[in-house]
């Protein structure tokens, strides 16, 4: 078992490493509120399609 076997061998059941964006699988800037589970970049892209409106 070489180094590639140890890379993702630790179980990720909780914490930042266990969650990812449902669109692009990114782990940074995740919006979990309301069960969105999207990174902020994908949220900006799909916010209008989801039904969010930008208030002035």
Curated annotation (Swiss-Prot):
Zn(2+) binds at residues 21, 24, 39, 42. Its main location: cytoplasm. One of its GO terms (cellular component) is cytoplasmic side of rough endoplasmic reticulum membrane. It is found in: Cytoplasm, Cytosol; Cytoplasm; Rough endoplasmic reticulum. GO terms for biological process: cytoplasmic translation. The keyword Lipid biosynthesis does not apply. PROSITE patterns: RIBOSOMAL_S14. The modification Omega-N-methylarginine is found at residue 12. InterPro entries: Ribosomal_uS14 (IPR001209), Ribosomal_uS14_CS (IPR018271), RIbosomal_uS14_euk_arc (IPR039744), Ribosomal_uS14_sf (IPR043140). Binds 1 zinc ion per subunit. Its cofactor is Zn(2+). The modification N6-acetyllysine is found at residue 48. It comes from the Eukaryota. Gene3D superfamilies: 30s Ribosomal Protein S14, Chain N. One of its GO terms (molecular function) is structural constituent of ribosome. Component of the small ribosomal subunit. The ribosome is a large ribonucleoprotein complex responsible for the synthesis of proteins in the cell. Belongs to the universal ribosomal protein uS14 family. Component of the 40S small ribosomal subunit. This is Small ribosomal subunit protein uS14. It comes from Sus scrofa.
